[in-house]
Amino acid sequence: MATIGFIGVGLAIGLAALGSGLGQGIASRGALEGMARQPEASGDIRTTLLLALAFMEALTLFSFVIAILMWTKL
């Protein structure tokens, strides 16, 4: 039964990392396209991008903590 739990922990962190990586890539692509189109707004775009990337990374870290908590309960 513990094997299923380890698979669940692996899936939890793996899917969180996958989702976060895809989201960060899409957000970065959009920000770079926006900076290329409007260079005068690059400061505002960069600030917004960094804030969004921090939130996305925080969700990944939260899922890592949850995965560790799940692992210790096995």
From Swiss-Prot:
SUPFAM superfamilies: F1F0 ATP synthase subunit C. CDD domains: ATP-synt_Fo_c. This is ATP synthase subunit c. Belongs to the ATPase C chain family. The chain crosses the membrane at residues 2-22, 49-69. The keyword Ion transport applies. It comes from Moorella thermoacetica (strain ATCC 39073 / JCM 9320). Keywords: ATP synthesis, Cell membrane, CF(0), Hydrogen ion transport, Ion transport, Lipid-binding, Membrane, Transmembrane, Transmembrane helix, Transport. It is found in: Cell membrane. The record marks 57 as: Reversibly protonated during proton transport. It is a multi-pass membrane protein. NCBIfam families: ATP_synt_c. GO terms for molecular function: lipid binding; proton-transporting ATP synthase activity, rotational mechanism. One of its GO terms (cellular component) is plasma membrane. F-type ATPases have 2 components, F(1) - the catalytic core - and F(0) - the membrane proton channel. F(1) has five subunits: alpha(3), beta(3), gamma(1), delta(1), epsilon(1). F(0) has three main subunits: a(1), b(2) and c(10-14). The alpha and beta chains form an alternating ring which encloses part of the gamma chain. F(1) is attached to F(0) by a central stalk formed by the gamma and epsilon chains, while a peripheral stalk is formed by the delta and b chains. F(1)F(0) ATP synthase produces ATP from ADP in the presence of a proton or sodium gradient. F-type ATPases consist of two structural domains, F(1) containing the extramembraneous catalytic core and F(0) containing the membrane proton channel, linked together by a central stalk and a peripheral stalk. During catalysis, ATP synthesis in the catalytic domain of F(1) is coupled via a rotary mechanism of the central stalk subunits to proton translocation. Key component of the F(0) channel; it plays a direct role in translocation across the membrane. A homomeric c-ring of between 10-14 subunits forms the central stalk rotor element with the F(1) delta and epsilon subunits.
